[in-house]
């Protein structure tokens, strides 16, 4: 079952992206490098509740 998650910037703590993930295949919190429009650079984004 796919669940909705929110990705937050680790620099400015803004929640920039909404996406889905397969909980069974990826039980850990997701981390990815994405563009933050508030920081105006590519930063690490982590999954939030």
From Swiss-Prot:
GO molecular function, one term: structural constituent of ribosome
Keywords from the UniProt entry: Ribonucleoprotein, Ribosomal protein
Pfam family, one: Ribosomal_L33
InterPro entries, per the entry: Ribosomal_bL33, Ribosomal_bL33_sf, Ribosomal_zn-bd
Keyword flag Ubl conjugation: no
Alphabetical GO biological process terms: translation
Superkingdom, natural source: Bacteria
UniProt-listed NCBIfam families: PRK00504.1 (NF001764), PRK00595.1 (NF001860), rpmG_bact (TIGR01023)
Name of this chain's protein: Large ribosomal subunit protein bL33
Organism, scientific name: Lachnoclostridium phytofermentans (strain ATCC 700394 / DSM 18823 / ISDg) (Clostridium phytofermentans)
């Amino acid at each position: 079952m796919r669940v909705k998650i929110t990705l937050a910037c680790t620099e400015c703590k803004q929640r920039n992206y909404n996406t889905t993930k397969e909980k069974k295949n990826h039980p850990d919190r997701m981390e990815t490098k994405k563009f933050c429009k508030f920081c105006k650079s590519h930063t690490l984004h982590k999954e939030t509740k």
